Each structure stands twice: as structure tokens, then as C-alpha cells.
Amino acid sequence: MVRFTSPPNSQVFNTRVWEIVRQIPSGQVTSYGQIAAMIPPPQGMDPKSYDAFAARWVGGAMAVCPEGVPWQRVINAQGKPSLRVGAQEQRKLLEEEGVNFNEKGRVDPKICGWSGPSPEWLSQHGLFPPPGFGH
């Protein structure tokens, strides 16, 4: 397997990530992996290699997202804010949106998991439907 530390075209990938994240409604969350699953692999990259790196690339995109992207709505696969600077702020912002955390600090995706953009929006943007996150 080839090692990719960043997407072949970071700006294009990051922009797609931010477009998706802007679609997440207030009070709902999704994971890095869910977002990655919506974005097709870059040209010339096999799907298996893409699957190995894509969620990390989404994390990288979120670390540099511009103002106005609701970054707090993207959590890790365990249903928690990421372990990084800003995790407490992320939780606070989500709670202000009505997202509840259990005693282990996790969000229940069955309650507030986002099922993804509309099929029309996905088609218009050349994206895949996400696998079920909590649904």
C-alpha cells in the first residue's frame, strides 16, 4: 500500500470537505469517516488506499477550515469530540445546539447523527451517499 500523508490535491479535497460540513444542520453530527466516504478517491488512487487515509485527510481539512464552517459538528467514530485543543469548546458548542452527551462523553448517533445531504445535492456535487451513521 502506498503511503499518502495528504491528499494529492489538498485544496480540492479540503474544499469538498468544507462544502459537505456546511450542509450539517445545527443539532446534528457526523464523523470524519462518514464525510470521507462521500468523497470519491482522487484520480489514480485505488479505493483501498483511499479508505486507509481519507478520514485522516478530513481531519486535516477540519484543522484548517475557514470561518463559517461548523467544525464542531464533526466528531470521531467513537461519538466524541476529537482529542485536540478545542475539544471542550466543541462540546460546549454542540450542547448549545441541543446535542446531548452521555456519561462517557459520547454522542448517540441514533439521536443526533446526520444522515447526509439530499441525493440531489450529492449528485450535483459528484459525491456518494454516506453509509448509515446511526440510522
Go through each PLM region and give its residues.
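Nucleic acid-binding interface residues in structured DNA/RNA-binding domains
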Residues: 2-135
